[in-house]
Amino acid sequence: MQDPHVPSSPTISSVSSSDLDTESTGSFFHDRSITLGTLMGFSFTATMPMPFRASSRRHVSPSVAISRASSSNARRNHQRKRPPSNSAEPEPHRRRKWWRFCRDDDDDAAGNGIHRGTGDSKRSSLGEYLEVERRFGDEAVYNSAEAELEDAVVARYQDQQPVMGERALFADGRVLPPASAEVVTGEGTPVATSLCRFPVSLTGICSGGGG
């Protein structure tokens, strides 16, 4: 005789075994809401809260937007009202030439690059050097205008030599050795006969003779 307290095994035609979720537990739990997932502690997806997804466009409150706009306008007006910092400076200091071919003796002793303009030495600019090249050119230097240009360079070079009986530092485009075994006379040594020698061209255009 079958015990009435022991449930019978389900058959294929039973209602409790028709659902996949309750097929394994239909023999013990005829309530279709009880599944293996609920026994393990999982809840239904319908009862779970949906995760909050933030929108791609960030929402800015009107008060924050107004404060940002006012701060940007105040900053823009402050920049317009600000006077230029270098307006009080004199014109020579404000438009200072940074390029120098040679060292000037009458510059500021502190190395600030301020030209005092005493007239002892004249600064040679890059524009003057390029103007000489444009004026004479390669063909003029090697042909008819060579003598004229050489005379100008040699004359300026001789004017810059000290009147103390010292000999020249350059000759024929090369640095002369020290006069240790020679007697120094007042006559200067011949300078270069061609402007194409780079040291001589530098010596001719330098204001103080020192690079």
From Swiss-Prot:
Induction trigger: Rapid but transient down-regulation by wounding, salicylic acid treatment or pathogen infection.
Expressing tissues: Expressed in inflorescences, stems, rosette leaves and weakly in roots.
UniProt cross-references to InterPro entries, sorted A to Z: At3g17950-like
Ranges in a coiled coil: none
Chain segments carrying region Disordered: 1-27, 54-94
Biased composition (Low complexity): 1-19, 61-74
PANTHER family: DUF4005 DOMAIN-CONTAINING PROTEIN-RELATED (PTHR33544), OS06G0256800 PROTEIN (PTHR33544:SF15)
Subunit structure: Interacts with RLK902.
Name of this protein: Uncharacterized protein At3g17950
Species the sequence originates in: Arabidopsis thaliana (Mouse-ear cress)
